[in-house]
């Protein structure tokens, strides 16, 4: 370990944690920083505004967290039905790129271009599938979801959380705010 690494570990003791423990520390930092300040499901832009003052790395993590959940529970297109506020969409794409997930950012942008124009037609869950299938787009959404989910490496099956860990270890000053 060189002097710079030793100094960084002294300043950021959480870097000595395991990946799983570091992920918990990041979630704790996010909870303190964003907490219940704004609702990411809202269309009012408050969530994007709330994360806008965070350090760039923590901001990227706050913006991409909900995409990870969408990839796990739904699909990359459905994400925009829950988290489609334009400011949050921009923050998420920028966040993916900041975290070194350029490929996922491309899949994300393509999925947004597919789903966003159709949102006015989607009133209920069944409408989403019917709308995309009737246009031959559901297969592409599934492909984009599979590609984004399969990006390696992953932590607990998540390429996004693995990127958080890699980023936090490489740039702790852009994540931790004490």
What is each PLM-predicted segment?
Residues 2-64, 68-74, 81-89, 95-178:
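Extended, alpha-helix-rich binding/interface surfaces that flank or overlap catalytic cores
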């Amino acid at each position: 370990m060189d002097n710079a690494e030793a100094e960084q570990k002294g300043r950021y003791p959480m870097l000595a944690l395991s990946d799983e423990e570091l992920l918990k520390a990041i979630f704790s930092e996010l909870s303190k920083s964003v907490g219940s300040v704004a609702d990411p499901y809202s269309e009012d832009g408050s969530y994007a505004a709330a994360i806008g003052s965070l350090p760039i790395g923590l901001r990227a993590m706050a913006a991409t967290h909900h995409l990870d959940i969408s990839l796990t529970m739904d699909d990359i297109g459905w994400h925009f039905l829950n988290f489609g506020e334009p400011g949050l969409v921009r923050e998420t794409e920028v966040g993916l790129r900041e975290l070194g997930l350029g490929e996922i950012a491309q899949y994300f942008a393509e999925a947004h271009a597919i789903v966003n124009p159709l949102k006015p037609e989607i009133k209920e869950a069944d409408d989403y599938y019917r709308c995309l299938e009737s246009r031959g787009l559901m297969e592409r959404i599934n492909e984009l979801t599979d590609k984004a989910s399969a990006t390696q490496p992953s932590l607990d099956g998540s390429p996004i959380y693995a990127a958080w860990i890699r980023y936090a270890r490489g740039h702790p000053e852009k994540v931790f705010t004490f």
